[in-house]
Every structure is written in C-alpha cells, then in structure tokens.
C-alpha cells in the first residue's frame, strides 16, 4: 500500500523517474527517509533486502540519476529489486489514463495494478518473455555481436517469444533466424528478470546439430564459433548471458580434455 513518508521510515530507497534510478555515490541509498530528504513523498514497499524494507518513490532527482545497469555488479537480489522498482515506476507512468475509456486511473491499494473506476478495467505490469541460448559445438561456443550492443562485446543468441509459441519453439526459431544453425538437446538452465524495459529472460543450453552460420545483418554485426580458451569480450558478470557462457565453457573444456 502507498503511504506518505513521515521521515522515520527506514530501508532501501528505489527513487526512479521510470527510466533511471537515483544512485548517490553510485549506490542505492539506505537509511531513513529524512536522511535522504524523502519525507512528504509518496512511497510503496516493493520487497525486502537484508531484513530491511525496499521502498519505491516514483520521482526523479536533479543529480545522480543513472541506469540500473550500474548495480549489475552488486548482489543479484539487490539488482532484481532495483529493477523491479524501475519497471513499476514505468508502469505507473504509462498507465495514468485508461486505454479503453480514457479516464484517469488510480493505483490499487491491494496489488500492483492500476484501476479505472469508470469502466472497471484493471491493468497489470507487462512482462515480455524472452529466450537466451548458449550453443556448443565440441570445444566451441557460438557467440555474436548484436547491433543494439555498444563496443566489441560478443554474447549468446536471444529473442522475444511470439504469440502462440512455446519457449522451445522460440529457441529453435530465433537460432535459425539469426544464425541459420540447427540445434539439439535443448535444456532449460535458469531465468533472470531484465528491466530493459520489462523482460524476463529464460536461459537455455543446446548443442549444435547442423548448418553453416549465416548471421542476420538486421540483428547481428557478426557471429562465429569461438574456442573456450579464445573468447572475445563478454557480457558483464551478474548477467544470465555471462552465466550461460561460463557454464558452456566448462562443458567445452571437459570435451577438450576427454577428446585429447
């Protein structure tokens, strides 16, 4: 439930303008509302971290606003809560008015939703399901440079789930569309909320089954097979992409040792 801060409330503070998050000294603020000049602001508790509440304040600040990506090297639980706050701030920003009748909406007091009292419509935060997959061929892993990524970073293939697809069908389709490679022995690994802007990444590993790499230039700048000990620049630690690559490297090394 939302409440007006009196000043003595304490915990972690996710202060977001729906795009960025407030990170004074590069860290998520912790302490009392008064310490961070938040008294009088409207806040909602969105979770707990280290036995302290995590509060969301939907408001920007004049300084120290940054991407939640800066928290990637923090504990995964803290990053997820910060990402949750940014996604909720964006949800509230984009759902001020009802998409059916145009009337102003109110935030639910009992759940994470926006309500229209005029037409009784109810809106929940959107989540975009995505797959991400590491493909192994012997002692090599398929990595690609995505057009949307800056610098020379290579990562595994990924894409959004389409209407009516299973996750497994999405993996096969995305891999074929982006690389023209066939896969086998697909298995689920883990998932990661990804607040850019509101995705849920579902991670898989697979083995190469056939085909020659022919990357889609609309999606990728480059794609190729890389030996486990000759890898290019990789995604940062804390990402599910990095975990997939590291797990695949273990399999590649074991294959090399067994074959050698």
Swiss-Prot record:
Taxonomy, superkingdom: Bacteria
Binding partners and assembly: Homodimer.
InterPro entries the UniProt entry points to: NAD-cap_RNA_hydrolase_NudC, NudC-like_C, NUDIX_hydrolase-like_dom_sf, NUDIX_hydrolase_dom, RNA_Hydrolase_NudC, Znr_NADH_PPase
Transmembrane segments: none
Record: residues binding a divalent metal cation 1: 158, 178, 219
Keyword match NAD: yes
Positions with a binding annotation for Zn(2+): 98, 101, 116, 119
Record field: catalytic activity: a 5'-end NAD(+)-phospho-ribonucleoside in mRNA + H2O = a 5'-end phospho-adenosine-phospho-ribonucleoside in mRNA + beta-nicotinamide D-ribonucleotide + 2 H(+); NAD(+) + H2O = beta-nicotinamide D-ribonucleotide + AMP + 2 H(+); NADH + H2O = reduced beta-nicotinamide D-ribonucleotide + AMP + 2 H(+)
Listed GO CC annotations: cytosol
GO BP: NAD catabolic process; NADH metabolic process; NADP catabolic process
NCBIfam families documented for this protein: PRK00241.1 (NF001299)
Keywords: Hydrolase, Magnesium, Manganese, Metal-binding, NAD, Zinc
Task performed by this protein: mRNA decapping enzyme that specifically removes the nicotinamide adenine dinucleotide (NAD) cap from a subset of mRNAs by hydrolyzing the diphosphate linkage to produce nicotinamide mononucleotide (NMN) and 5' monophosphate mRNA. The NAD-cap is present at the 5'-end of some mRNAs and stabilizes RNA against 5'-processing. Has preference for mRNAs with a 5'-end purine. Catalyzes the hydrolysis of a broad range of dinucleotide pyrophosphates.
Name listed for the protein in its UniProt record: NAD-capped RNA hydrolase NudC
Residues that bind a divalent metal cation 2: 174
Xref: Gene3D superfamilies: 3.90.79.20, Nucleoside Triphosphate Pyrophosphohydrolase
Cofactor: Mg(2+); Mn(2+); Zn(2+)
């Amino acid at each position: 439930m939302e409440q007006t801060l009196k000043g003595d409330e304490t915990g972690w503070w996710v202060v977001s303008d729906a795009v960025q998050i407030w990170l004074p000294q590069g860290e998520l603020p912790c302490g009392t509302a008064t310490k961070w000049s938040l008294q009088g602001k409207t806040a909602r508790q969105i979770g707990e971290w280290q036995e302290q509440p995590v509060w969301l304040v939907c408001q920007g600040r004049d300084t120290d606003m940054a991407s939640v990506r800066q928290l990637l090297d923090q504990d995964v639980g803290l990053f997820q809560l910060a990402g949750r706050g940014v996604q909720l701030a964006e949800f509230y920003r984009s759902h001020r008015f009802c998409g059916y009748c145009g009337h102003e909406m109110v935030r639910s007091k009992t759940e994470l939703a926006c309500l229209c009292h005029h037409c009784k419509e109810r809106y929940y935060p959107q989540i975009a399901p995505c797959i991400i997959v590491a493909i192994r061929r012997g002692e090599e892993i398929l990595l690609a440079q995505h057009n949307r990524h800056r610098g020379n970073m290579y990562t595994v293939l990924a894409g959004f789930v389409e209407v009516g697809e299973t996750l497994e069908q999405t993996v096969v389709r995305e891999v074929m569309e982006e690389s023209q490679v066939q896969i086998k022995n697909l298995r689920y690994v883990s998932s990661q909320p990804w607040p850019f802007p509101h995705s849920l990444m579902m991670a898989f590993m697979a083995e190469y089954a056939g085909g020659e790499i022919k990357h889609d230039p609309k999606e990728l700048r480059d794609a190729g097979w890389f030996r486990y000990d000759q890898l290019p620049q990789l995604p940062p630690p804390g990402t599910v992409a990095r975990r997939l690559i590291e797990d695949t490297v273990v399999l590649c090394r074991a294959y090399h040792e067994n074959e050698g």
